[in-house]
Amino acid sequence: MEDYIVRATAKEGTIRALAAITTNMVKEAQKVHGLSPLATVALGRTMTAAAMMSTTLKEENAVITLQIKGDGPIGGIVVVVDSSANVKGYVHNPLVYLPLNSQGKYDVAGAVGNGYLNVIKDLGLREPYVGHVDLVSGEIAEDITYYYAYSEQVPTATALGVLTNATEIVVSAGGFILQLMPGADDDTISFIENKISSIPPVSTLLAQNKSPEDILEMLLSEKDMKIIGKSPCRYLCNCSRERMERNIMTLGKEEIMGMINENHGAEAHCHFCNKKYWFSEEDLLRLVKIIESQKS
């Protein structure tokens, strides 16, 4: 099944719903970074959340960055998504390992630890919007839910899942986000809470070949659900030699000259796809000349 996101509404527009399958995306991240199963689950949940959150982006060049920083052994998680749901991400410690938690599941909360979540929305304006919340669990889904409630004042329910098999290969990944819009009553809140608690984990449903549409149907069929859109999502890094050149130039002339004198060149490494770019002395001298011309 291809990766995609479904958008829906229910109960006369008072419920906004998103559901996604992201299995291929998470498999690609696992392959690109050589992730341990625990790191795969942690990054996969975060990428799935970001993919669904990208559906709110209207501007073509807009991006959302999720930064999770904790005191656990994974160190941190960074995910970036654009308005086309092209997702890229990495964890600081890709080989993190912990014993299973008391429920027999990967201990994402233990790997993340105590810390914070930043949601940075760059909409092409003068300054990006930055939402900052403390982590409430480190399990990712609960932290996304808390972010929406605290920073955007939108009551939200979030479910995120990554399922691996005995050989530590990703079997399924995906999630859903349900949000209450103005006009939703207490009965609607109770209905959603009961529905969510009554269905299996989202990764289990996807492994059973349930589609995102099927999952939303299970949750909202009694509330006149309407599918309003479907769009692809994928793991894609947009790094390039030109982008790396711009990054090097931000270091300034003195630091670039130091690279030339000490190493006779420089290697730039993309954290999102692990691609490496080599810049020779001649390349760096050319960048220095560009910097000098910009100052004159």
From Swiss-Prot:
Per UniProt, what is one GO molecular function of this protein? protein folding chaperone
Compartment(s) = Cytoplasm
> Where would one find coiled-coil regions in this protein?
none
Q: Which CDD domains match?
A: Hsp33 (cd00498)
Keyword terms: Chaperone, Cytoplasm, Disulfide bond, Redox-active center, Zinc
Give the top-rank taxon of the lineage listed in the UniProt record for this protein.
Answer: Bacteria
Quick one: a GO biological-process term for this protein?
Answer: protein refolding
Q: Which Pfam families match?
A: HSP33
Keyword Disulfide bond part of the UniProt annotation: yes
Which pairs are disulfide-linked? 237-239, 270-273
**Modified how:** Under oxidizing conditions two disulfide bonds are formed involving the reactive cysteines. Under reducing conditions zinc is bound to the reactive cysteines and the protein is inactive.
Q: Chief subcellular site?
A: cytoplasm
Does the keyword Amino-acid biosynthesis belong to this entry? no
The molecule here is called 33 kDa chaperonin
